Amino acid sequence: MNVFNPAQFRAQFPALQDAGVYLDSAATALKPEAVVEATQQFYSLSAGNVHRSQFAEAQRLTARYEAAREKVAQLLNAPDDKTIVWTRGTTESINMVAQCYARPRLQPGDEIIVSVAEHHANLVPWLMVAQQTGAKVVKLPLNAQRLPDVDLLPELITPRSRILALGQMSNVTGGCPDLARAITFAHSAGMVVMVDGAQGAVHFPADVQQLDIDFYAFSGHKLYGPTGIGVLYGKSELLEAMSPWLGGGKMVHEVSFDGFTTQSAPWKLEAGTPNVAGVIGLSAALEWLADYDINQAESWSRSLATLAEDALAKRPGFRSFRCQDSSLLAFDFAGVHHSDMVTLLAEYGIALRAGQHCAQPLLAELGVTGTLRASFAPYNTKSDVDALVNAVDRALELLVD
């Protein structure tokens, strides 16, 4: 592992060769050359499909495909690579848990506790399964620090509480609840915990054994990998208890017109031809990341967010919604609509996001209709911070009387 060098890290990203300033990594990360090359080589040189053909190239491809599963298991300190299921992304992973695990077990009146800080991907699937089963969704509110109020869980948990859905890291504030404490409360009541790791996996991948996590989901594209590939980790006994969501090739053991028997997990949950290119690309991203000190890289990103926050705080009307010195900086200006601001920033070459960030209940709790969000990554620089601040100043001159 090398000492983190921002300039060397940045040089690995072809998309940064232009003059733009990219501050939207919380939406999707840019891709390093290693991932671009691995994906290109797959499409250029690979032949065959995984877990199907018997010729040598197909067998080698299957081995690479399964080796990637092992890499993800190592990233999360999962006890077994068979606890790793390939999906299209975090959203599909959570929906799979809701439909394949929760739906067959929930009864009318059962409760699903969901934090108000959740991305819609960790709320809407639970609202859907509640409608389907007669269960109800119970809101876990924020505390004074704008974090899910984990200390309220003992009051919210009842004999009907079945599932806790909690994000590792907010995609708006960057706040991280005390997962260990929340999981302890939930497990003491016999609940199953679904952790949304879409943001957290990028900054500090969860140790699923140490935290005793039941289900954990993340997406490859936020972790410098390709789009369309995601991960669901589940404890072995929970995955085996899940009914397959999709039926088709390679998820079955035997099939007749009288019925079928499924493969064991994870393959019973992976019907059809998988996103092999996505798996190969994610594997390349993890191999590439292993050469860097993630903690040092995270410290760099956080320092840039702090520089930006401190500079913008000198402008009238500035409000920050940032938590815990995160690398995500959600902010707004009094009297300035976020859509107007982001439009001007785009004209000035600054790429960031504005709006509700797929977290409408959280924005309502924060008392705003939307915010701007600058999300800093290890490939960003102090020059990017200066460019953001200068662009904001130009925009404020036009937008504020």
UniProtKB/Swiss-Prot annotation:
It comes from the Bacteria. Catalyzes the removal of elemental sulfur and selenium atoms from L-cysteine, L-cystine, L-selenocysteine, and L-selenocystine to produce L-alanine, and transiently retains the released sulfur atom on a cysteine residue, in the form of a persulfide. Can also desulfinate L-cysteine sulfinate (3-sulfino-L-alanine), which is the best substrate of the enzyme. Functions as a selenium delivery protein in the pathway for the biosynthesis of selenophosphate. Seems to participate in Fe/S biogenesis by recruiting the SufBCD-SufE proteins. GO terms for molecular function: cysteine desulfurase activity; cysteine sulfinate desulfinase activity; hydrolase activity; pyridoxal phosphate binding; selenocysteine lyase activity; sulfurtransferase activity. Induction: Induced in persister cells. Disruption phenotype: Cells lacking this gene display a high decrease in the level of ct(6)A modification in tRNAs, and show the t(6)A modification instead. They also exhibit a fitness defect, are unable to swim, and are more resistant to the norfloxacin antibiotic than the wild-type. Keywords: Hydrolase, Lyase, Pyridoxal phosphate, Transferase. Cysteine desulfurase activity is increased 2-fold in the presence of CsdE. Optimum pH is around 7.0 and 7.5 for the removal of selenium and sulfur atoms from L-selenocysteine and L-cysteine, respectively. This is Cysteine desulfurase CsdA. Homodimer. Forms a heterodimer with CsdE. Disulfide bonds: none annotated. InterPro entries: Aminotrans_V_dom, Aminotrans_V_PyrdxlP_BS, Cys_desulphurase_CdsA, Cys_dSase_SufS, PyrdxlP-dep_Trfase, PyrdxlP-dep_Trfase_major, PyrdxlP-dep_Trfase_small. Changing C176A: No loss of activity. Its cofactor is pyridoxal 5'-phosphate. Pfam families: Aminotran_5. Its EC number is 2.8.1.7, 3.13.1.-, 4.4.1.16. The modification N6-(pyridoxal phosphate)lysine is found at K222. Belongs to the class-V pyridoxal-phosphate-dependent aminotransferase family. Csd subfamily. It catalyses: (sulfur carrier)-H + L-cysteine = (sulfur carrier)-SH + L-alanine; L-selenocysteine + AH2 = hydrogenselenide + L-alanine + A + H(+); 3-sulfino-L-alanine + H2O = sulfite + L-alanine + H(+). GO terms for biological process: iron-sulfur cluster assembly; L-cysteine catabolic process; selenocysteine catabolic process; sulfur amino acid metabolic process; sulfur compound transport. Coiled coil: none annotated.
